């Protein structure tokens, strides 16, 4: 994973380009994310930085978590996440990760949790075709066969069935940053991102090959 920043989805709107075309964009409150730990190959076996996000009350954290954050003089932070790096020589604990990590027109990957839809049936969750809705049919929204009786005599693992829909980790790749607002720590990204307003997002740089 490339170095990135944590943020909060604020919502969607639209902006207009020079030709007057409407562009759908998502507004993201990104960072600042203080560095809470620097991991090196000498001490941990790999190079990475750990960053924090979303300040909270100390009573919401354990003593172990508070002690970990106090090592770098950070306040109580609800979210901690690691980003792998090639070298930690240029990383300073005193300098938090901000939106200045990105520039206009950069391409990024954004990860978040999709909106949870609760317990859903076959048609809504997996787009199954429904049965006839009239003429004496008793198979309106049933799943149909889920396996033979004697052989194999069981339901195969992974069979698509009714269950909880959504609330899964989703990564949208190749999104374009339209504008970086350093003063208000905002990223304006073209297109949609996972989750509902207020959801946690991870924005990472795309590795250049």
Curated annotation (Swiss-Prot):
Subcellular locations according to the entry: Plastid, Cyanelle
Swiss-Prot/TrEMBL keywords: Cyanelle, Plastid, Ribonucleoprotein, Ribosomal protein, RNA-binding, rRNA-binding
Family per similarity comment: Belongs to the universal ribosomal protein uL3 family.
Gene3D superfamilies: 3.30.160.810, Translation factors
Lineage per the UniProt record: Eukaryota, Glaucocystophyceae, Cyanophoraceae, Cyanophora
Protein role: One of the primary rRNA binding proteins, it binds directly near the 3'-end of the 23S rRNA, where it nucleates assembly of the 50S subunit.
BP term (GO), one: translation
Highest taxon, organism lineage: Eukaryota
An annotated GO cellular component: cytosolic large ribosomal subunit
InterPro entries per record: Ribosomal_uL3 (IPR000597), Ribosomal_uL3_bac/org-type (IPR019927), Ribosomal_uL3_CS (IPR019926), Transl_B-barrel_sf (IPR009000)
Subunit structure, as described in the record: Part of the 50S ribosomal subunit.
Annotated region (Disordered), positions in chain: 132-154
GO molecular function: rRNA binding; structural constituent of ribosome
Protein name: Large ribosomal subunit protein uL3c
């Amino acid at each position: 994973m490339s170095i990135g920043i944590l943020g909060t989805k604020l919502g969607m709107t639209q902006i207009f380009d020079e030709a007057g075309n409407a562009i759908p964009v998502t507004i993201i409150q990104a960072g600042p994310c203080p560095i809470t730990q620097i991991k090196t190959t000498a001490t941990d076996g790999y190079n990475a930085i750990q960053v924090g996000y979303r300040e909270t009350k100390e009573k919401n954290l354990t003593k172990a978590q508070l002690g970990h954050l106090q090592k770098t003089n950070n306040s109580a932070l609800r979210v901690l996440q690691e980003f792998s790096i090639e070298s930690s020589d240029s990383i300073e604990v005193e300098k938090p990760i901000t939106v200045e990590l990105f520039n206009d027109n950069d391409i990024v990957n954004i990860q978040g949790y999709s909106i949870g839809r609760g317990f859903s049936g076959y048609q809504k969750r997996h787009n199954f075709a429904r049965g006839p809705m009239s003429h004496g049919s008793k198979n309106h929204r049933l799943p149909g066969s889920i396996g033979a009786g004697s052989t194999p005599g069981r339901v195969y693992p992974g069979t698509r069935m009714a269950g909880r829909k959504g609330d899964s980790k989703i990564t949208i790749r190749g999104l374009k940053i339209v504008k970086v607002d350093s003063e208000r720590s905002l990223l304006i990204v073209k297109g949609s991102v996972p989750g509902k307003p207020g959801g946690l997002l991870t924005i990472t740089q795309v590795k250049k090959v």
